[in-house]
Amino acid sequence: MRDSDIGIWWVDAFTDRAGGGNPAAVCALSKPLAPAVMQAVAAELGLSETAFVEPPGSEGVRPLRWFTPSVEVDLCGHATLAAAHVLADASSSVRFATRSGEVAVARLGERGLELDFPAATVGEEPSGEAGLAELAGALGETPVWAGRGGPDVLVELPSAAAVAEC
């Protein structure tokens, strides 16, 4: 890989001062890289997330992927914000194609960015009462409702106090 194939930025998201906020690396690629190479770069950089942005396709949408030092993740808000900060000029918008769907970013004024993430689909946990009983045993509290959003189980508990006790 030549030096010109990748530009790397360290961006502190959600702050206006260096060293604050939530850091992410942004790698602007001149061509796609193999996932193993992206994983190795993310591991070497050592931040919680590294965003890899490819050049835009024919419709202007840029492929975007996120890697932790050990695994690729489906979505990362602060690294998306960091990538948009690196790529969006004062008057532009950016669209990213991700494993979670398309993310649109619009410039708001001189320093603001608005991110529009795809809505996650959540369905009720199909295992019904048996599933709720199993969750109650694991949590020490009976859930009001449980559902799935992708590989994640979402649980509604009866109160904030019940959440604090878990």
Residue ranges and their predicted role:
Residues M1-L75, A79-C166:
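Active-site proximal loop and beta-alpha junction motif in alpha/beta enzyme cores
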